Amino acid sequence: MRTYAQLARLDRPIGNFLLLWPVLWALWIAAAGVPDLDLLVIFTLGVVVMRAAGCVINDFADRHIDGHVKRTRQRPFATGRVSEREALLLFVVLCLLAFGLVLLTNPLTILMSLVAVVLAATYPFTKRYTHLPQVHLGLAFGWAVPMVFAAQTGTVPVVAWLLLIATVLWATVYDTMYAMVDRDDDIKIGVKSTAVLFGDLDRLMIAILQGLMLLAMVQVGLHVEASTAYYLGLAGAAGLFAYQQYLIRRRERQDCFRAFLNNAWLGGVVFAGLAADLHL
């Protein structure tokens, strides 16, 4: 069981936070600060289950690669502790669990969940064919946003798509930082990423993406007529983005990873501003 837990990254909760924050942003906006408790539970559990499923299929896709990358060479596939059949079975079971949760919502959300499964299942293979797997990951992570609006309101309004765009931009930012950790190994074995694509322009491109993410969140705020508290949250996020730029200035592996981890705090700061705006 410990091996399966490691395969599903249950021992590394950072991914759950990165997935959960946009879901909470969406829930609070869609419900004007008072989301249905059952939907809060459904989507929180769904985040944990689908993130685990995504990690399993990612390791399956990278089973011939992870042994050649310093950061991943101790993963279950790389060390021979899990078989392909076991991983695929676990992926299917997790997807079925997630689908069972979605069945507790409404027809529109159920239909949209099919797209979520396709995005999660195909993401790990994109790094073989495009330098933009981080964008695909953003779509996979962010697709829960329109699903939340569908579940809470029965529709997917414009603000949901604005929030999805912001989430995709944010995911591209932090996953590019994550990819910078493995860039040297990825170049050697031919794995593609935005970190490889950007090269020496990586910090500049990350800064541009950070700015665009904040701009998208400003548009969300304007759309919902947010107050000062919301924009103070965005100001806090901007400060954390600046700190992340400081961390990655030398492009050292450990510092890039610290910058990646810092995004869990950033999502919380944005949520705090949003919640304060809706409740004060």
Curated annotation (Swiss-Prot):
This is 4-hydroxybenzoate octaprenyltransferase. Catalyzes the prenylation of para-hydroxybenzoate (PHB) with an all-trans polyprenyl group. Mediates the second step in the final reaction sequence of ubiquinone-8 (UQ-8) biosynthesis, which is the condensation of the polyisoprenoid side chain with PHB, generating the first membrane-bound Q intermediate 3-octaprenyl-4-hydroxybenzoate. It is a multi-pass membrane protein. It is found in: Cell inner membrane. The chain crosses the membrane at residues 14-34, 37-57, 88-108, 131-151, 154-174, 204-224, 228-248, 260-280. Keywords: Cell inner membrane, Cell membrane, Magnesium, Membrane, Transferase, Transmembrane, Transmembrane helix, Ubiquinone biosynthesis. One of its GO terms (biological process) is ubiquinone biosynthetic process. InterPro entries: HB_polyprenyltransferase-like (IPR006370), Prenyltransferase (IPR039653), UbiA_prenyltransferase (IPR000537), UbiA_prenylTrfase_CS (IPR030470), UbiA_sf (IPR044878). The keyword DNA-binding does not apply. Belongs to the UbiA prenyltransferase family. Disulfide bonds: none annotated. Gene3D superfamilies: UbiA prenyltransferase (1.20.120.1780). Its EC number is 2.5.1.39. Pathway: Cofactor biosynthesis; ubiquinone biosynthesis. It is an enzyme of class 2 (transferase). It comes from Halorhodospira halophila (strain DSM 244 / SL1). Its cofactor is Mg(2+). It catalyses: all-trans-octaprenyl diphosphate + 4-hydroxybenzoate = 4-hydroxy-3-(all-trans-octaprenyl)benzoate + diphosphate. Pfam families: UbiA. The gene is ubiA. GO terms for cellular component: plasma membrane. The keyword Cell membrane applies. GO terms for molecular function: 4-hydroxybenzoate polyprenyltransferase activity.
